[in-house]
Amino acid sequence: MADNTNSTGSFSTLVDWQRCSVEEQRQLLTRPAISASDRITAVVSDILTNVKSRGDGALRDYSAQFDKVQVDAIRITDAEIAAASARLGDEVKQAMAIAVRNIETFHNAQKLPIVDIETQPGVRCQQITRPIATVGLYIPGGSAPLPSTVLMLGTPSRIAGCRRVVLCSPPPIADEILYAAQLCGIKEVFQLGGAQAIAAMAFGTDSVPKVDKIFGPGNAYVTEAKRQVSQQLDGAAIDMPAGPSEVLVIADSGATPAFVASDLLSQAEHGPDSQVILLTPDAVMAKAVADAVEEQLTQLSRADIARQALASSRVIVARDLAQCIEISNQYGPEHLIIQTRDAESLVDSITSAGSVFLGDWSPESAGDYASGTNHVLPTYGYTSTYSSLGLADFQKRMTVQQLTPQGLLQLAPTIEILAQAEQLTAHKNAVTLRVAALKEQA
């Protein structure tokens, strides 16, 4: 294990993976704990119950309590959205337009063809998709509003054909968020934040319509509220489990340390519980990146936040690139950046990652904003079972089958035997009666 002497907490330590025990290796890939405390769970449960029983009155009380805002009209008017659009500069509008164009292009390409096939003569099976009727989008506010998340959620919901799209964001809602909503054709915007916004969308109030599925990131209270409503019969489905943002960078000896450092810091500045990991077979590169991180930190407006994140982050020196991939697959990062000389050749070996960025010229921020891929990604190891958000998340699949008389006659013995094996007599009879009717007609 080698040390350097800069002051970025544990990120200043270069860890030799080969010299670590299995338990030490496991600890190195452990994420910061995010389990909701009993207090958060109880507070959120009370908020959900209160909103369910008191509706808009509870929403106004919580806005005053948590957001320090007296909200009269919960819904933002068309005039307010138009005014926000007028205040916003053309430069930002043009940037959003380009981002939307690329997001549209990528998500349009995800449309599934209808599956229509005869599995055997006279037995036709189809798979068709339908949009989820009503979806709710939660967009965080505060010191760093996220209009890009509006684009990432609003664009696929529109392409999918969702009949109703509801957006909630804490008051006062930033002009950028309101304009992004307008750009995506979202007309129902509500100035609501926190667990109360999730409750309003899950259960519905006089002002806020009940939705079928809720999308979007948030703090610990929002995350816990989404978890709770997804487990209630009268609640709503959710996009995916959420955790702090994270990135893992694999760099070889030819990588540019400043580029690698900038990508690591792009995630570290998200929040103190973010985690960033550098994997490299080159100890010289590892030290150069650690030094570049320290140098760039001094230029960041959110340097204090980034430093806190770096305290639970890692610089790991592996045996070779193959081992880097093995470690990355074990960790399953939200963002995986591969800055190697033949990055594309490694893709087939990657089994778990939310979004992958190949080469020196593919910064993680490109995917965050404008390349076209979605930036709503599984975190906290959920990449082993969850996918990046896409068009399919705003849709549902249905299957259709149609049997001709001859098709049923051919398949009937198979169905009857299996139904009998499971001792489901009515299932068997549904076939036997039809077969008898067909034989009478013959």
Swiss-Prot record:
Residues the record lists as binding Zn(2+): 267, 270, 368, 427
UniProt GO molecular function: histidinol dehydrogenase activity; NAD binding; zinc ion binding
PROSITE patterns named among the record's database cross-references: HISOL_DEHYDROGENASE
Active site: residue positions: 334-335
Residues that, per the record, bind substrate: 245, 267, 270, 335, 368, 422, 427
GO CC terms, sorted: cytosol
CC cofactor: Zn(2+)
Alphabetical UniProt keywords: Amino-acid biosynthesis, Histidine biosynthesis, Metal-binding, NAD, Oxidoreductase, Zinc
SUPFAM superfamilies according to UniProt: ALDH-like
Taxonomic superkingdom: Bacteria
EC number annotated for this UniProt entry: 1.1.1.23
Entry note: cofactor: Binds 1 zinc ion per subunit.
Biological pathway: Amino-acid biosynthesis; L-histidine biosynthesis; L-histidine from 5-phospho-alpha-D-ribose 1-diphosphate: step 9/9
Sites where the protein binds NAD(+): 138, 196, 219
Enzyme class, spelled out: oxidoreductase
InterPro entries reported in the protein's UniProt record: Ald_DH/histidinol_DH, Histidinol_DH_CS, Histidinol_DH_monofunct, Hstdl_DH
Family: Belongs to the histidinol dehydrogenase family.
Oligomer and partners: Homodimer.
HAMAP family to which the protein is assigned, alphabetical: HisD (MF_01024)
Official protein name in the record: Histidinol dehydrogenase
Species of provenance: Pectobacterium atrosepticum (strain SCRI 1043 / ATCC BAA-672) (Erwinia carotovora subsp. atroseptica)
Lineage: Bacteria, Pseudomonadati, Pseudomonadota, Gammaproteobacteria, Enterobacterales
